């Protein structure tokens, strides 16, 4: 049975994740006008694009909301972000620069805590600003149902009646004015921005075009480090970790993890650290592009991985990177609380993170330009005294030991040579193999045939769309498409 409502449930309470922007404001007013009972829930996630988050719920009252609540999600979001950091749960990277999954982290927390707040008020229907082409519609759906199995979903922007009447910013603003309701006429930006305490996402509109670069974005957590007119002074910073958690910055301990992250953001931000331009694969396997900021997470990540490399052996590092990447994709898909994710997360936090204790000093310059000045810790596996190229009093092994070790390698080298000789005899090396294998085998059995041009386009095309589908597709939502 579908949990998604396609028409307004008149007479019932509907919870709306309320941002105070044009789209959610008009949605609340329209639902009240049409007979539903809107209740708004605003998440305080430390978002840098809303400096006065405390005032947002009061705005909802003016549009007819029966319940207006501000839910403080910052502590939970910081904790989940620290867990992701300890696990290296970041799977998207370009040119060595990672995306720190800051939006998926935020959705896991808000999608859970807002629905729980609604449940306390007896609200069983939930709506948010995610569009049907993006990731968030599925993330919120999964987390919402995990928090409340009886939840039903209503999104005005998937309701043909709503979109017919209020399909774009112009129609929305005119509707509010016609009904005597306040309208904050903010300037429409060339791209959409979504932020929380861990980072900011810039996407959609002009940024969908790959000939538009990162330099068109105005950072909200950092500075335009690419602009030579922006003065950025060199700065040294020391970050301390204990058992996989950051505990100090420049020797200072903080009253809460939230305060520590805010300080890390401030330091990384004034250097433009942690900005990246990514092409990624959405949940639905369509590619999208985003420009991301995460100055504090980037700073902590540099320090954490420096310590991880100093402490753990090669196989542990391989597991950390491989499983961390898998966990990052699960989080991206809205599966951060699924059993398979919890299993990976617990293993990495327990066997990788808890051993990570130490301090790293960095010299920050512009953007990703930094130097590591010092690395200290009580349990490093790095022992230069044992492997020095100079004469040492107590080396780990001597030349005769190494000769013996090399001799023991003869067996596996011989095995490798034997396999290569066998492959030559079979025609796998040096000559075409007489028996088709791989794609050639599939072609020989008829599973892969002629591939005429244009087939991929035919598969991806939706065909002739109905008027209603076209209208929903063109609905202009200022929240973007993530």
Curated annotation (Swiss-Prot):
<keyword id="KW-0028">Amino-acid biosynthesis</keyword>
<comment type="similarity">
    <text>Belongs to the argininosuccinate synthase family. Type 2 subfamily.</text>
</comment>
<dbReference type="InterPro" id="IPR024074">
    <property type="entry name" value="AS_cat/multimer_dom_body"/>
</dbReference>
<dbReference type="InterPro" id="IPR048268">
    <property type="entry name" value="Arginosuc_syn_C"/>
</dbReference>
<dbReference type="InterPro" id="IPR001518">
    <property type="entry name" value="Arginosuc_synth"/>
</dbReference>
<feature type="binding site">
    <location>
        <position position="99"/>
    </location>
    <ligand>
        <name>L-citrulline</name>
    </ligand>
</feature>
<dbReference type="InterPro" id="IPR024073">
    <property type="entry name" value="AS_multimer_C_tail"/>
</dbReference>
<dbReference type="GO" id="GO:0042803">
    <property type="term" value="F:protein homodimerization activity"/>
</dbReference>
<feature type="binding site">
    <location>
        <position position="203"/>
    </location>
    <ligand>
        <name>L-citrulline</name>
    </ligand>
</feature>
<feature type="binding site">
    <location>
        <position position="131"/>
    </location>
    <ligand>
        <name>L-aspartate</name>
    </ligand>
</feature>
<feature type="region of interest" description="Disordered">
    <location>
        <begin position="461"/>
        <end position="482"/>
    </location>
</feature>
<feature type="binding site">
    <location>
        <position position="129"/>
    </location>
    <ligand>
        <name>ATP</name>
    </ligand>
</feature>
<keyword id="KW-0436">Ligase</keyword>
<dbReference type="GO" id="GO:0000053">
    <property type="term" value="P:argininosuccinate metabolic process"/>
</dbReference>
<feature type="binding site">
    <location>
        <position position="43"/>
    </location>
    <ligand>
        <name>ATP</name>
    </ligand>
</feature>
<dbReference type="Pfam" id="PF20979">
    <property type="entry name" value="Arginosuc_syn_C"/>
</dbReference>
<dbReference type="GO" id="GO:0005737">
    <property type="term" value="C:cytoplasm"/>
</dbReference>
<feature type="binding site">
    <location>
        <position position="135"/>
    </location>
    <ligand>
        <name>L-aspartate</name>
    </ligand>
</feature>
<dbReference type="Pfam" id="PF00764">
    <property type="entry name" value="Arginosuc_synth"/>
</dbReference>
<comment type="pathway">
    <text>Amino-acid biosynthesis; L-arginine biosynthesis; L-arginine from L-ornithine and carbamoyl phosphate: step 2/3.</text>
</comment>
<feature type="binding site">
    <location>
        <position position="136"/>
    </location>
    <ligand>
        <name>ATP</name>
    </ligand>
</feature>
<dbReference type="InterPro" id="IPR023437">
    <property type="entry name" value="Arg_succ_synth_type2_subfam"/>
</dbReference>
<feature type="binding site">
    <location>
        <position position="201"/>
    </location>
    <ligand>
        <name>L-citrulline</name>
    </ligand>
</feature>
<keyword id="KW-0963">Cytoplasm</keyword>
<feature type="binding site">
    <location>
        <begin position="17"/>
        <end position="25"/>
    </location>
    <ligand>
        <name>ATP</name>
    </ligand>
</feature>
<dbReference type="InterPro" id="IPR023434">
    <property type="entry name" value="Arginosuc_synth_type_1_subfam"/>
</dbReference>
<dbReference type="InterPro" id="IPR014729">
    <property type="entry name" value="Rossmann-like_a/b/a_fold"/>
</dbReference>
<keyword id="KW-0067">ATP-binding</keyword>
<dbReference type="GO" id="GO:0004055">
    <property type="term" value="F:argininosuccinate synthase activity"/>
</dbReference>
<dbReference type="InterPro" id="IPR018223">
    <property type="entry name" value="Arginosuc_synth_CS"/>
</dbReference>
<comment type="subunit">
    <text>Homotetramer.</text>
</comment>
<protein>
    <recommendedName>
        <fullName>Argininosuccinate synthase</fullName>
        <ecNumber>6.3.4.5</ecNumber>
    </recommendedName>
</protein>
<dbReference type="GO" id="GO:0000050">
    <property type="term" value="P:urea cycle"/>
</dbReference>
<dbReference type="GO" id="GO:0005524">
    <property type="term" value="F:ATP binding"/>
</dbReference>
<feature type="binding site">
    <location>
        <position position="139"/>
    </location>
    <ligand>
        <name>L-citrulline</name>
    </ligand>
</feature>
<feature type="binding site">
    <location>
        <position position="135"/>
    </location>
    <ligand>
        <name>L-citrulline</name>
    </ligand>
</feature>
<keyword id="KW-0547">Nucleotide-binding</keyword>
<feature type="binding site">
    <location>
        <position position="136"/>
    </location>
    <ligand>
        <name>L-aspartate</name>
    </ligand>
</feature>
<dbReference type="InterPro" id="IPR048267">
    <property type="entry name" value="Arginosuc_syn_N"/>
</dbReference>
<dbReference type="GO" id="GO:0006526">
    <property type="term" value="P:L-arginine biosynthetic process"/>
</dbReference>
<keyword id="KW-0055">Arginine biosynthesis</keyword>
<feature type="binding site">
    <location>
        <position position="280"/>
    </location>
    <ligand>
        <name>L-citrulline</name>
    </ligand>
</feature>
């Amino acid at each position: 049975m579908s949990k998604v409502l396609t028409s307004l449930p008149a007479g019932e309470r509907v919870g709306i994740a309320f941002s105070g922007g044009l789209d959610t404001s008009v949605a609340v007013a329209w639902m009240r006008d049409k007979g539903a009972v809107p209740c708004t829930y605003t998440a305080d996630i430390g978002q840098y694009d809303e400096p006065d988050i405390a005032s947002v719920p009061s705005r909802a009252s003016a549009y007819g909301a029966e319940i207006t609540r501000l839910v403080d999600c910052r502590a939970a979001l910081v904790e989940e972000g620290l867990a992701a950091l300890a696990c290296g749960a970041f799977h998207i990277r370009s040119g060595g620069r990672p995306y720190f999954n800051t939006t998926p982290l935020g959705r896991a927390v808000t999608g859970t805590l807002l629905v729980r707040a609604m449940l306390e008020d007896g609200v069983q229907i939930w709506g948010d600003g995610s569009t049907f082409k993006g990731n968030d519609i599925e993330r919120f759906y999964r987390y919402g149902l995990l928090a409340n199995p009886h939840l039903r979903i209503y999104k005005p922007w998937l309701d043909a009646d709503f979109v017919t009447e209020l399909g774009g910013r112009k129609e929305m603003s005119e509707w509010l004015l016609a009904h005597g309701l306040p309208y904050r006429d903010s300037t429409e930006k060339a791209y959409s921005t979504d932020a929380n305490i861990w980072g900011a996402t810039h996407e959609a509109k002009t940024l969908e075009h790959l000939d538009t670069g990162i330099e068109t974005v105005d950072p909200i957590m950092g500075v335009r480090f690419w602009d030579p007119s922006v003065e950025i002074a060199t700065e040294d910073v020391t970050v301390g970790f204990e058992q996989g958690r950051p505990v100090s910055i420049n020797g200072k301990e903080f009253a809460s993890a939230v305060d520590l992250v805010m300080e890390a953001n401030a330091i990384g931000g004034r250097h433009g650290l942690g900005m990246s331009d990514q092409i990624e694969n959405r949940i639905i396997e369509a590619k999208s592009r985003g420009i991301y900021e995460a100055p504090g997470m980037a700073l902590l990540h540099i320090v954490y991985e420096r310590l991880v490399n100093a402490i753990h052996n090669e196989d542990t590092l391989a597991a950390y990177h491989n499983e961390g990447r898998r966990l990052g994709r699960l989080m991206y898909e809205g599966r951060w609380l699924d059993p398979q994710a919890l299993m990976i997360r617990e293993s990495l936090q327990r066997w990788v993170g808890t051993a990570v204790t130490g301090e790293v000093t960095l010299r920050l310059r512009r953007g990703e330009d930094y130097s590591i000045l010092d690395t200290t810790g009580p349990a490093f596996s790095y022992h230069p005294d044992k492997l020095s190229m100079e004469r040492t009093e107590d080396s780990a092994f001597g030349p005769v030991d190494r000769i013996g070790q090399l001799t023991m390698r003869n067996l596996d080298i011989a095995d490798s040579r034997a396999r290569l000789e066998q492959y030559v005899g079979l025609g796998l090396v040096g000559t075409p193999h007489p028996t088709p294998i791989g794609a050639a085998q599939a072609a020989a059995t008829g599973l892969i045939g002629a591939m005429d041009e244009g087939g991929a386009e035919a598969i991806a095309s939706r065909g002739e769309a109905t008027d209603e589908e076209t209208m929903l597709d063109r609905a202009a939502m200022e929240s973007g498409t993530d």
